[in-house]
UniProtKB/Swiss-Prot annotation:
Function of the molecule: Together with LptD, is involved in the assembly of lipopolysaccharide (LPS) at the surface of the outer membrane. Required for the proper assembly of LptD. Binds LPS and may serve as the LPS recognition site at the outer membrane.
InterPro entries named in the record: LPS_assembly_LptE (IPR007485)
Protein name: LPS-assembly lipoprotein LptE
Entry's Gene Ontology BP terms: Gram-negative-bacterium-type cell outer membrane assembly; lipopolysaccharide transport
Keywords: Cell outer membrane, Lipoprotein, Membrane, Palmitate, Signal
Lipidation (S-diacylglycerol cysteine): 20
First-listed, main subcellular location of the protein, grouped into a coarse class: membrane
Subunit structure: Component of the lipopolysaccharide transport and assembly complex. Interacts with LptD.
Positions of N-palmitoyl cysteine lipidation: 20
Length: 184
């Protein structure tokens, strides 16, 4: 009896989530204009640039190595900053918990068009356990890597805003040109 009830409840859960259009977030569908681009960075083999490159590949973006090409869009990773602020302290005044902040600055250069700035900020908290000093360093490295991967995912998702702002700009230009043509 319990097995049938469990199967019924599981089936209802599947039907409800399928019926409402819920789906897990997969890879980002990058706009057609950005399916091929140049990835330009001051540290091309650094961990952040590698994370961005991996996210672009997961989104089926072809990365061109020739940074001098002017005919295809370019994603420039301008830089990143990591800060660490104290969130809480122990009774003896030592730091108990940090808030780590990673900010990534980038820009997209569209050939013959504008430069679109992108900024991504990722927050994480980190508990500083004074009894496990060696494990603390390893855990902090893992948290930093996860923050880089999350920032890279957000950066690739923000490429959609470049496409959206281009469409708005094109609509405004066509509206202005049709308004000027009707006045003439």
């Amino acid at each position: 009896m319990r097995h049938r009830l469990f199967t019924l409840l599981l089936g209802l859960a599947v039907l409800i989530t399928a019926g409402c259009g819920f789906h897990l977030r997969g890879t980002t569908q990058v706009p057609a204009q950005l399916q091929t681009l140049v990835l330009d960075s001051s540290d091309p083999y650094g961990p952040l640039t590698r994370a961005v490159r991996e996210q672009l590949r997961l989104s089926d973006v072809k990365i061109v190595d020739d940074a001098t090409r002017q005919d295809i869009p370019s994603l420039r990773v301008l830089g990143s900053s990591e800060t660490r602020d104290t969130v809480s302290i122990f009774q003896d005044g030592k730091t108990a918990e940090y808030q780590m902040v990673l900010t990534l600055q980038a820009q997209v250069l569209m050939p013959g068009e504008d430069i679109y700035p992108l900024s991504v900020t990722v927050f994480r908290t980190f508990f500083d356990n004074p009894l496990a000093a060696l494990a603390k360093d390893a855990e902090q490295d893992i948290v930093r890597q996860e923050m880089r991967e999350q920032a890279a995912q957000q950066l690739v998702r923000k490429l959609l805003t470049v496409n959206g702002s281009q469409e708005v700009k094109n609509r405004q230009q066509s509206t202005h040109s049709t308004a000027a043509a009707t006045r003439s």
